């Protein structure tokens, strides 16, 4: 910042009312904060005209030159500082739309991916539970299928045994029919033989004479034969009826058993077909679930790989941004150090200005209001007026100021 100041006049038009102004010490000293500027003050002799000697004028000229150079350096440093601040502001404005939205979008993408991963995990767990349930159902159906298969084998064995019994009954029936045919043939042969014998006897008796003899009544052979024949026929008919009735009952029972067995066999076959269809459908569904699980696992692996690569890219971007921020911080620290240096320079410059002002004030105090009293004032040995060169000084009286 520019420093505006005014220098006190080289001549004092008013006199000190309370006490006489004394000059500084006649010994040489160095101004603090003035980088070892020679500020030797000459002897205590004063001109009556109130002007400075040659050494004091050179010191004031040197201080003015140093002050001008310091002010120019301060202005240059302020311009450099403003340029650096503008450059930092431009870089921050250029990088701001790249940092904040990109981080927010990456965070949103990461949250969405985490939600998708959680949904995939829950879906995988649900599929695993469904697969376990399907496995349990398949095991139940397998046990039922094995039970029904054993029942089917038992029914088939019963059917085979019944078929053997049916074959045996068929053989018995054929045997009985053969026996009945043989009995019929035997009956016919007996009838033929009986008729032949009757005819033969009739022929023999027809040629003989009829002799009436008182004897027991003759036996009617035809009647006996008819009775015998009737008895045999009744017996044969009874046996035939019994055999037919037994055969009918056995056949009916076998037919009922065969019908019931065939119905059970058909029901078992239909149930077996249905169970096979169910098992095939469950196997197809299980294979589809396995394929879905494999595809989901592959998709999850690909998603994890892709998102890990994206995360590594984001981490690298974050690392680059952090390095840029570290550079900016280092630049800011360097600028702060430069600013501290400028503040130190300013403090030293203000100290020099205060020293310069105190020197001018002390020189103003040296100028006497009465030129004739100069010798008396200078003859008194008084110590130095400058006790603290860097502090403000009180003036002996009002003085005019001008720009040097």
Swiss-Prot record:
The keyword Nucleus does not apply. InterPro entries: IF_conserved (IPR018039), IF_rod_dom (IPR039008), Keratin_I (IPR002957). GO terms for cellular component: cytoskeleton; cytosol; extracellular exosome; extracellular space; intermediate filament. The record marks 305 as: Stutter. Residues 1-56 are annotated as: Head. Residues 220-363 are annotated as: Coil 2. Residues 364-404 are annotated as: Tail. Residues 103-203 are annotated as: Coil 1B. GO terms for molecular function: structural molecule activity. Residues 57-91 are annotated as: Coil 1A. One of its GO terms (biological process) is epithelial cell differentiation. Residues 204-219 are annotated as: Linker 12. SMART domains: Filament (SM01391). Residues 92-102 are annotated as: Linker 1. Keywords: Coiled coil, Intermediate filament, Keratin. Residues 56-367 form the IF rod domain. There are two types of hair/microfibrillar keratin, I (acidic) and II (neutral to basic). Belongs to the intermediate filament family. This is Keratin, type I cuticular Ha3-II. It comes from Homo sapiens (Human). The lineage of its organism: Eukaryota, Metazoa, Chordata, Craniata, Vertebrata.
């Amino acid at each position: 910042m520019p420093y505006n100041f005014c220098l006190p006049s080289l001549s004092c038009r008013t006199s000190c009312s309370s006490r006489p102004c004394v000059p500084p010490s006649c010994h040489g000293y160095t101004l603090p904060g003035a980088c070892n500027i020679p500020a030797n003050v000459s002897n205590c002799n004063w001109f009556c005209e109130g002007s400075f000697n040659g050494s004091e004028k050179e010191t004031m000229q040197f201080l003015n030159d140093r002050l001008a150079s310091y002010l120019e350096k301060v202005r240059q440093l302020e311009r450099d500082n403003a340029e650096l601040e503008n450059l930092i502001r431009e870089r921050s404005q250029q990088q701001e739309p790249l940092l904040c939205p990109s981080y927010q979008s990456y965070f949103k993408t990461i949250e969405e991916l985490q939600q998708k991963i959680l949904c995939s995990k829950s879906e995988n767990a649900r599929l695993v539970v469904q697969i376990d349930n399907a496995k349990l159902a398949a095991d139940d159906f397998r046990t039922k299928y094995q039970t029904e298969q054993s029942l089917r084998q038992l029914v088939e064995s019963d059917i085979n045994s019944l078929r053997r019994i049916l074959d045996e009954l068929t053989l018995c029936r054929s045997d009985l029919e053969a026996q009945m045919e043989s009995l019929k043939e035997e009956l016919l042969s007996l009838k033929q033989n009986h008729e032949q014998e009757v005819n033969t006897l009739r022929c023999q008796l027809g040629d003989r004479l009829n002799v009436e003899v008182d004897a027991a009544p003759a036996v009617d052979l035809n009647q006996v034969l008819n009775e015998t024949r009737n008895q045999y026929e009744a017996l044969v008919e009874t046996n035939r009826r019994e055999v037919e009735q037994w055969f009918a009952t056995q056949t009916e029972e076998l037919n009922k058993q065969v019908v019931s067995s065939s119905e059970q066999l058909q029901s078992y076959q239909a149930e077996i077909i249905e169970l096979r269809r169910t098992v095939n459908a469950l196997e197809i569904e299980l294979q589809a679930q396995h394929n879905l699980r494999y595809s989901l696992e592959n998709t999850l692996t690909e998603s994890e790989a892709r998102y890990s690569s994206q995360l590594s890219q984001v981490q690298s971007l974050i690392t680059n941004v952090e390095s840029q921020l570290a550079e900016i911080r280092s630049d800011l620290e360097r600028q702060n150090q430069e600013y501290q240096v400028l503040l130190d320079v300013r403090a030293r410059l203000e100290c020099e200005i205060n020293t310069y002002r105190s020197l001018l004030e002390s020189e103003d105090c040296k100028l006497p209001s009465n030129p004739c009293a100069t010798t008396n004032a200078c003859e008194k040995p008084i110590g130095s007026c400058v006790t603290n060169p860097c502090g403000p000084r009180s003036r002996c009286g009002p003085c005019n100021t001008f720009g040097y």
